[in-house]
UniProtKB/Swiss-Prot annotation:
SUPFAM superfamilies: Photosystem II reaction center protein L, PsbL (SSF161017). The chain crosses the membrane at residues 18-38. The lineage of its organism: Bacteria, Bacillati, Cyanobacteriota, Cyanophyceae, Synechococcales. The keyword S-adenosyl-L-methionine does not apply. This is Photosystem II reaction center protein L. PSII is composed of 1 copy each of membrane proteins PsbA, PsbB, PsbC, PsbD, PsbE, PsbF, PsbH, PsbI, PsbJ, PsbK, PsbL, PsbM, PsbT, PsbX, PsbY, Psb30/Ycf12, peripheral proteins PsbO, CyanoQ (PsbQ), PsbU, PsbV and a large number of cofactors. It forms dimeric complexes. It comes from the Bacteria. GO terms for biological process: photosynthesis. InterPro entries: PSII_PsbL, PSII_PsbL_sf.
Amino acid sequence: MQVNENPNKVPVELNRTSLYLGVLSVLVLGILFSSYFFN
């Protein structure tokens, strides 16, 4: 990992990945709960 070259770019990527993972997890949980309720 080359953190010394772009120290400001690493946390931004981590934040973006965390946001994408959070949105995906919420969507998956919503689909699962909706399927349980409909069934």
